[in-house]
């Protein structure tokens, strides 16, 4: 399908955004993530196309998925763009890990996590499906190593107790095996997939927020918030960062749904930069 001559996004200028919901502009007065290295575990980064977006990276994928790392701009590029918008001074590392075979994907993720440890990354983020119990064992062991080295993880649908588990502005979903730690706005306006949107327009359903609905983006947004904090307090450990983000969050109601811990990143940064007694 050819792209339509115009893309219309109703109420685009008056919608709540990450910046209004989570007080990002106020946080930017203190930090934009400078000096923090964030790795994204994903696919289709357009690594050779968007060279200015990435500080580095590595491709651990096999076959056709491996080819998508370099020239195809899709999910990984989307997540990187979202992260860059939240923490524009952070260094972004593209780590190609996706496969339609879960075992191969976890193999790639384990390699990527080891690479992140060796290259002194500060944060790792993942935005895809939950894992089966048999593959969780290998992944948990790898994440344990990362956490022990001070690397913060923000993985959706991943209930490891050391992981910062984000979710949407709403109640716990069926894909989470424990109560999420943080609530994040789940509408992302940075990227729209044109064919999908054109399909919605053709069927008369392209209205409201629908083309921007994104649980995926809650993970890189959370990673961006961690980067803002780590930039001003690089000594903070993963457990401390989780505690700070949770303790400074607030209860909200959005679209009629209650969220117990909506991130207020400005409050979080103020809490770690106020003069110590």
Where are these regions (language model features)?
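Extracellular S/T/G-rich loop segment that most often corresponds to the catalytic His/Ser-adjacent loop
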Residues: 42, 148-151, 156-235, 239
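Short helix-loop-beta-strand segments that form the rim/entrance of peptidase-like active sites
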Residues: 83-102, 236-252
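Substrate-binding/access-modulating region of protease and related hydrolase catalytic domains
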Residues: 78, 97-169, 209-220
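C-terminal subdomain of the subtilisin-like protease fold in secreted/lumenal serine endopeptidases
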Residues: 1-7, 15-25, 123-125, 231-277
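Short glycine-/small-residue-rich Rossmann-like dinucleotide-binding loops
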Residues: 45, 128-129, 196
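Active-site core segment of subtilase-fold serine proteases
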Residues: 2-91, 111, 118-123, 176-183, ...
């Amino acid at each position: 399908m050819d792209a339509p001559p115009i893309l219309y996004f109703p109420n685009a200028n008056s919608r709540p955004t990450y910046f209004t919901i989570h007080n990002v502009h106020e946080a930017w007065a203190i930090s934009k993530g400078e000096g923090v290295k964030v790795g994204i575990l994903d696919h289709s980064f357009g690594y050779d196309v968007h060279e200015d977006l990435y500080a580095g990276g590595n491709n651990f994928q096999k076959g056709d998925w491996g080819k998508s790392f370099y020239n195809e701009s899709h999910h990984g590029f989307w997540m990187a763009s979202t992260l860059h918008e939240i923490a524009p001074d952070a260094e972004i590392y593209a780590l190609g890990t996706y496969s339609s075979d879960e075992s191969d994907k976890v193999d790639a993720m384990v390699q990527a996590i080891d690479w992140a440890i060796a290259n002194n990354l500060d944060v790792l983020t993942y935005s895809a499906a939950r894992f089966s119990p048999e593959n969780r064992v290998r992944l948990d062991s790898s994440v344990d190593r990362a956490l022990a080295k001070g690397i913060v993880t923000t993985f959706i649908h991943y209930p490891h107790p050391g992981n910062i588990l984000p979710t949407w502005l709403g109640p716990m979903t069926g894909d989470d095996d424990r109560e999420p730690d943080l609530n994040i706005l789940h509408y992302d306006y940075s990227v729209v997939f044109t064919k999908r949107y054109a399909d919605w327009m053709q069927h008369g359903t392209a209205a409201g927020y629908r083309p921007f609905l994104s649980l995926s983006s809650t993970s890189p947004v959370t990673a961006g918030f961690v980067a803002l904090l780590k930039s001003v307090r690089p000594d903070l450990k993963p457990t401390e960062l989780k505690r700070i983000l949770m303790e400074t969050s607030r209860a909200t109601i959005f679209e009629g749904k209650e969220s117990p811990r909506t991130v207020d990143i400005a409050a979080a940064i103020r809490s770690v930069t106020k003069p110590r007694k």
